[in-house]
Amino acid sequence: YADGVSPPQRALKELISGTIFAVSENQSRPVHTGCRFEVTETDITVVAVDGYRLALRRFHFEEAAGRVMTFVAPGAALKEVEKILGDTDEEARFTLGSKHLMFQIGEATLVCRLLEGEFLDWRRVLPTENPIKLTANVEQLNASIERVSLIVSERLKSPVRCVFSDNSADFKTVTTIGAAHDVCSVAGDGKNLEIGFNCRYLLDALKAVPAQEVTLELSNGLSPIVLTPTDGSDQFAYMVLPVRLKESM
């Protein structure tokens, strides 16, 4: 356990809570049931993927930490670590062994086995050249999608149909129990782009955004939507894959 990194507890907590919801529950690819940590001398990037979405959070050290490491930590262990971490600037240390990872948080020590396997090449998957960029208030957008998702359930899994036009986002969904429609104002022109989403994935991403406003990056109706910071920083990225829409909605 020679290689150690000591971010503030608050930062590590945000890295975990901002990604853990997107880990896969599918045991056929065990490596994706954990979060990938990429530690450089200047920052820590944490990524989770589950086949339908991607969550990324990044923390920049105030001064170079001097350690470089990449590993995948199990989601179950990270949930326990998240519970122990406080909202404080006190350090939380994690050190990498050959097959294990050790967290030291205050008086607590937690050791977990690393996940092995080929983690998704997320840099190749995350689209960066998205021609449509819209800015939205996170709370308003969240409320709009929540209202139309009231008639969606595990059993009635209808996608939400979104139409992004000039300064507005129009949400509709239809299930066997009814129809719902809501409009949210956004800044920018969506060029009448129509796209379908699993509303739970979009809501999970919005709830994890650590800001009051967010940029929605879009390309076309069959490409993912990416939520990024409005200030152009690389602090977070949330990608959700679209759902094909039936014409009748």
Predicted regions and their residues:
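Structural preference for solvent-exposed beta-strand-turn elements
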Residues: 1-249
